[in-house]
């Protein structure tokens, strides 16, 4: 077997803000290293999910191995690990970054440094990586590469003269990037003879071969026939195949050694056995310590998912199980609702993650779903001294037992052109944000960095859309969790015809509860079909009704058959109708149609503007 020379390996990642051209740049690198023939080339080659290509974003980390003959005449092996750019997938990025020695930090020459660029930059710094700044999209008419290079130096402290100007579209500067990877990024360290120590940075599920973990080997080697052990669970498996990634797919090899990036098949059936971020070692010669700094991904946003047709409950469970195989961050547990029947309470990393999971369930598994309003995890301190977590607003304990309710807060970093600062500050004030810092950036563009602290629940719903509309799309944001703080929060129940509809219950700040409740009852009154009796729709905090709307009754024209004639006859018919309605009202049940839930999700969450 040919030993890989470690000094000829370069492991690197590309990090960027959404839309700064990361995937296009990866495409050019594949082309220039002749890894992909022109015939096979397609846009966003590494984004394998149909949804990724359609939305133009990278959701899962993906790896590829290419060979490059450098100007010094030597042939190098590059392992490129592509990372997601969206803030929801920060944990995926941190794992991908742990598997490499250097990163290309891609910044759009027309946009400059954005909020997520900064967040990813700090992660790469924490790992102690070599960072090569790449100013991309220099072919754009409004590109200002020199200014952006100076901004990178000012904001991130990376010397402007080290920046490489490139265009993923035309291919200009890409050769220079490849040379910089060889020159600046250090080769991996590691001893192939030491006990095996491999980091799992991603995994995919294959119907025939089970779970295929993606590995970066730090020490030792692994080959078919080896007995491996998963560090955190202690489970053991026998390796069937090992191999590397090529752009055309997975290719089996004889062995994987320290410094390499690859995959293995070992008939692993359960995704929970190989948690991403876990360490893999040999059963008979385990490594003394696992790879540090990993935690299981923890969901921060919860929503109920229910099948429109209750007969598809089993199908939904199987679909969620399958998605979880590729998505360690997704959690779900069964829940039932009087209004929606049986479904699941699902946990996500953020709103985009929730949206993508729902879209994949509908697309790949052909399900029709209803999602309840997303909510954050509240902590409740009870008078008895214990603390409970509340994932579903309907589960909030009785107010008489509650000492205080704590809500999660986030630190927001926002980059915006100067002229939008006023309207953004107004938006953040409305969202109960508190200004921590404000920093004017150098350059002719006059951009400002705003740092705020705000309740997570406030920025969960429509904040991103409103941030974009207030700033005409120029502002960008990134957030991180900063812990829990007490808040003046109340649970609002929505009653239709005197019955609480659990799926519409929400937790809100006391000051905002009234406006949100008003919007919800008005919207419900529009979408609930009229009955033969009038239907009151109310919102209540405890026993106090704070908003009400009424669906007016339908009336049959009982006088149609009376021509002229005696007025007492007409009165008798009308009285009879009234009596009948009274009886109906007492025993009548109102079905809340599915559209009503969807309508409320859009209504109740957009607070009235103005």
Swiss-Prot record:
Disulfide bonds: none annotated. GO terms for biological process: positive regulation of translation. Gene3D superfamilies: 3.30.70.240, Elongation factor 4, C-terminal domain (3.30.70.2570), Elongation Factor G (Translational Gtpase), domain 3 (3.30.70.870), P-loop containing nucleotide triphosphate hydrolases (3.40.50.300), Translation factors (2.40.30.10). One of its GO terms (molecular function) is ribosome binding. InterPro entries: EF-4 (IPR006297), EFG_III/V (IPR035647), EFG_V-like (IPR000640), EFTu-like_2 (IPR004161), G_TR_CS (IPR031157), LepA_C_sf (IPR038363), LepA_CTD (IPR013842), LepA_IV (IPR035654). It is an enzyme of class 3 (hydrolase). Keywords: Cell inner membrane, Cell membrane, GTP-binding, Hydrolase, Membrane, Nucleotide-binding, Protein biosynthesis. Residues 7-189 form the tr-type G domain. It catalyses: GTP + H2O = GDP + phosphate + H(+). It is found in: Cell inner membrane. It comes from the Bacteria. The keyword Hydrolase applies. It is a peripheral membrane protein. GO terms for cellular component: plasma membrane. The keyword Membrane applies. HAMAP family: LepA. This is Elongation factor 4. It comes from Thermus thermophilus (strain ATCC BAA-163 / DSM 7039 / HB27).
């Amino acid at each position: 077997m040919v030993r890989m020379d470690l000094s000829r390996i370069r492991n690197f990642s590309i990090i960027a803000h959404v839309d700064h051209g990361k995937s296009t740049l990866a495409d050019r690198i594949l082309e220039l290293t002749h890894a992909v023939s022109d015939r096979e080339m397609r846009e966003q080659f590494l984004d394998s999910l149909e949804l990724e290509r359609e939305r133009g974003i990278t959701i899962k980390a993906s790896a590829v191995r290419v060979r490059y003959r450098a100007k010094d005449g030597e042939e190098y092996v590059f392992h490129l690990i592509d990372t997601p750019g969206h803030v929801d997938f920060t944990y995926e990025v941190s794992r991908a970054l742990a598997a490499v020695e250097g990163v290309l930090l891609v910044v759009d020459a027309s946009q400059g440094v954005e909020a997520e660029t900064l967040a990813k930059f700090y992660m790469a710094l924490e790992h102690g990586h070599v960072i090569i700044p790449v100013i991309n999209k220099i072919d754009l008419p409004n590109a200002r590469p020199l200014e952006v290079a100076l901004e990178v130096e000012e904001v991130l402290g990376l010397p402007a003269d080290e920046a490489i100007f490139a265009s993923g579209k035309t291919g200009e500067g890409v050769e220079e990037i490849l040379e910089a990877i060889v020159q600046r990024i250090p080769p991996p360290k590691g001893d192939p003879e030491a006990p095996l120590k491999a980091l799992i940075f991603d995994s995919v599920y294959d119907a025939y071969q089970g779970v295929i973990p993606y590995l970066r080997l730090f020490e030792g080697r692994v080959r078919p026939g080896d007995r491996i052990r998963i560090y955190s669970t202690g489970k053991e498996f026998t390796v069937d195949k090992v191999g590397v990634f090529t752009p055309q797919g997975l290719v089996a090899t004889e062995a994987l050694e320290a410094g390499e990036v690859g995959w293995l098949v070992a008939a692993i059936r359960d995704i929970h056995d190989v948690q991403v971020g876990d360490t893999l070692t040999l059963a008979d010669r385990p490594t003394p310590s696992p790879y540090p700094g990993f935690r299981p991904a923890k969901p921060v946003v919860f929503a109920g998912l229910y099948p429109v047709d209750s007969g598809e409950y089993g199908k939904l469970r199987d679909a969620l199980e399958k998605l979880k195989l590729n998505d360690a961050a997704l959690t779900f547990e069964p829940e039932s609702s009087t209004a929606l029947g049986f479904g699941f309470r699902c946990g996500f990393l953020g709103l985009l993650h929730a949206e993508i999971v729902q879209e994949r369930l509908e697309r790949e598994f052909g399900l029709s779903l209803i999602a309840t309003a997303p909510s954050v995890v509240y902590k409740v301190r009870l008078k008895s001294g214990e603390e409970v977590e509340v994932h579903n607003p309907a589960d909030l304990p009785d107010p008489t037992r509650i000492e205080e309710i704590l809500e999660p807060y986030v630190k927001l970093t926002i980059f915006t052109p100067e002229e939008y600062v006023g309207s953004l500050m107004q938006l953040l004030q409305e969202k109960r944000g508190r200004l921590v810092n404000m920093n004017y950036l150098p350059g002719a563009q006059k951009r400002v960095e705003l740092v705020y602290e705000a309740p997570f629940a406030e920025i969960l719903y429509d904040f991103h859309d409103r941030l974009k509309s207030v700033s005409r799309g120029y502002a960008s944001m990134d957030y991180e969790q900063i812990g829990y703080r007490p808040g003046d929060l109340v649970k609002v129940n929505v009653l239709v015809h005197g019955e609480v509809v659990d799926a519409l219950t929400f937790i809100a700040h006391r000051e905002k509860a009234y406006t949100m409740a008003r919007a919800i009852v008005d919207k419900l009154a529009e979408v609930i079909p009229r009955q033969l009796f009038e239907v009151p729709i109310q919102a209540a905090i405890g026993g106090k009704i704070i908003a009400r709307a009424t669906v007016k009754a339908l009336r049959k024209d009982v006088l149609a058959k009376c021509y002229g004639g005696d007025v007492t006859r007409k009165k008798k018919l009308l009285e009879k109708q009234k009596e009948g309605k009274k009886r109906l009202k007492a025993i009548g049940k109102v079905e809340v149609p599915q559209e009503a839930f969807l309508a409320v999700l859009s209504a109740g969450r957009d607070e009235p503007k103005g």
